[in-house]
């Protein structure tokens, strides 16, 4: 009994139809107006009418179909749509008979009749506000055409009209600059850059790293003297003193004003035998500025063998508080000549210092201590005139924080024909002193990393036997 009931329930479930959609509801209402009994003709005619309906009519039937679905859900809560499987046997397509064109023509007649009846109804009804959608549907209704192939010419013409009515894209032709115009534009840009204020800075970036390379005052400088050389010899970080003095005929005009006795500065002059004949600036007016102070001469980057023409002259122990050798005043620390032997003007005395690099600041011995991690502390005081009043060293600072290399430096620079291999043992002793140095001084104790210091980390001009 239960099995039979379940079979009946299954039959009832299978017999439940789907709820009608908006088009089917529209077809149910308009089907009575069509006199034809052919379902294909009815579907074609009603489909054409549905496409020409206004949005209000379509919205009405869509709301009606939503109510129909809710009603169907209440009546059949267990209903679930399962699409039917297609049969494996394919049906053969029936050939269109020549008589099929006759009832298609009848469809046109029916559409024209429906359009005429709608016009007569509108004429009898009172006038209403004009609706654009209804007017468009009324205009399209009599002009409908339905070809045999099933494709509407109306769609094709609408596509063509859309293509023709689309706005044309104007091709704006930009006149390209000729080569002469580009050159003139570049020249005018460079002329403007020369007139730009010097306060404007331009940064350049490296193409590989992306970091800024440097800063220049302007792209093109009309005054070439504003370009500072790479290796500046000035102590205050300004334009190089030697470069300025080489451009002026008078040597005493650009000397520092805070120096007490600038004319008493002595300039060493070497004769053909190699002896030093000192002579003041006032006694040698024929000495040109470019020979006295020359910074633009080529500089050899390789360490050359130092040679001193006079063996009796040796560098003195520095009496400065910093490792660059400046006494606090404006110091004219520029070399007198570029070469292996370089003389520096310092105070009122002429101190000869032999260094392979002309850009090394005076004195070289203090730079050795700065590179090795130790500092030279001096008790000398500096006055406004730039001269040291007290030239004494504190014994405790000298014993704790300073490596005495006077004996080594005298033997190092006294011989004119110096060979690095001959003094390799002395260099090793010096490096061993720096490496094994220990002190309780707070300045030296804060530099514990000096134990890992090797000869390669010292100043580049320091002789090293491993390089040769």
Swiss-Prot record:
Subcellular location per the Swiss-Prot or TrEMBL entry: Nucleus; Cytoplasm
Pfam families in UniProt: HMG_box
PTM sites of type Phosphothreonine: 173
Result after altering residue 218 to A: 100% activity; nuclear accumulation
Record region (Disordered): 1-21, 249-290
Annotated keywords: Activator, Cytoplasm, DNA-binding, Nucleus, Phosphoprotein, Stress response, Transcription, Transcription regulation
GO cellular component: cytoplasm; cytosol; nucleoplasm; nucleus; RNA polymerase II transcription regulator complex; Tor2-Mei2-Ste11 complex
Modified how: Phosphorylation results in inactivation.
GO molecular function, one term: DNA-binding transcription activator activity, RNA polymerase II-specific
InterPro entries named among the record's database cross-references: HMG_box_dom, HMG_box_dom_sf, SOX_TF
Top-level taxon of the source organism: Eukaryota
Composition-biased stretches (Polar residues): 249-263, 274-285
Signal as UniProt keyword: no
CDD domains membership: HMG-box_ROX1-like
Modified residues (Phosphoserine): 209, 211, 218
Entry keyword Ribonucleoprotein: no
DNA-binding residues: 16-80
GO biological process: induction of conjugation with cellular fusion; positive regulation of induction of conjugation with cellular fusion; positive regulation of transcription by RNA polymerase II; regulation of transcription by RNA polymerase II
Induction of its expression: By nitrogen starvation.
Biological role stated in the UniProt entry: Key transcription factor for sexual development. Activates the transcription of the matp, matm, mei2, mfm, ste6 and rgs1 genes. Binds specifically to a DNA fragment carrying a 10-base motif 5'-TTCTTTGTTY-3'.
Protein name: Transcription factor ste11
Organism of origin: Schizosaccharomyces pombe (strain 972 / ATCC 24843)
Upper taxonomic lineage: Eukaryota, Fungi, Dikarya, Ascomycota, Taphrinomycotina
Gene behind the chain: ste11
């Amino acid at each position: 009994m239960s099995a039979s009931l379940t079979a009946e329930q299954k039959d009832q479930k299978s017999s439940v139809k789907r709820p009608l959609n908006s088009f089917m509801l529209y077809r149910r209402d308009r089907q009575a107006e069509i006199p034809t009994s052919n379902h294909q003709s009815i579907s074609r005619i009603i489909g054409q009418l549905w496409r020409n309906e206004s949005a209000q009519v379509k919205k009405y039937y869509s709301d009606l179909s939503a109510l129909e679905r809710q009603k169907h859900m209440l009546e059949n809560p267990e209903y679930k749509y399962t699409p039917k499987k297609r049969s494996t046997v394919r049906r053969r397509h029936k050939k269109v008979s020549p008589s099929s064109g006759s009832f298609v023509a009848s469809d046109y007649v029916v559409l024209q009749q429906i359009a005429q009846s709608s016009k007569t109804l509108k004429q009898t009804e009172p006038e209403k506000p004009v609706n654009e959608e209804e007017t468009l549907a009324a205009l399209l209704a009599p002009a409908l055409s339905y070809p045999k192939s099933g494709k509407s010419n109306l769609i094709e013409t609408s596509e063509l009209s859309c293509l023709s009515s689309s706005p044309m894209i104007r091709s704006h032709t930009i006149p390209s600059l000729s080569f002469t115009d580009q050159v003139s534009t570049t020249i005018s840009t460079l002329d403007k850059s020369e007139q730009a204020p010097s306060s404007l800075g331009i940064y350049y970036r490296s193409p590989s790293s992306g970091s800024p390379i440097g800063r220049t005052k302007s792209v093109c400088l009309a005054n070439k003297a504003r370009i500072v050389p790479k290796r500046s010899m000035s102590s205050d970080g300004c334009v190089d003193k030697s470069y300025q003095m080489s451009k002026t005929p008078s040597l005493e005009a650009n000397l520092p004003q805070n120096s007490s006795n600038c004319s008493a500065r002595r300039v060493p002059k070497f004769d053909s035998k190699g002896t030093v004949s000192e002579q003041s600036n006032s006694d040698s007016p024929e000495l040109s500025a470019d020979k006295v102070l020359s910074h633009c001469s080529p500089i050899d980057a390789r360490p050359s063998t130092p040679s001193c023409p006079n063996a009796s002259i040796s560098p003195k122990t520095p009496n400065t508080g910093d490792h660059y050798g400046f006494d606090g005043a404006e110091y004219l620390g520029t070399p007198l000549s570029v070469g292996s032997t370089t003389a520096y003007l310092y105070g009122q005395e002429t101190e000869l210092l032999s260094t392979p690099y002309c850009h090394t600041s005076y004195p070289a011995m203090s730079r050795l201590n700065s590179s090795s991690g130790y500092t030279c502390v001096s008790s000398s005081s500096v006055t406004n005139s730039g001269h040291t009043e007290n030239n004494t060293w504190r014994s405790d600072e000298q014993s704790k924080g300073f490596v005495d290399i006077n004996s080594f430096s005298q033997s190092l620079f006294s011989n004119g024909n110096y060979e690095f291999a001959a003094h390799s043992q002395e260099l090793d002793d010096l490096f061993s002193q720096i490496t094994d140095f220990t002190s309780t001084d707070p300045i030296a104790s804060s530099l514990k990393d000096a134990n890992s210091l090797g000869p390669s980390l010292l100043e580049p001009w320091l002789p090293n036997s491993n390089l040769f």
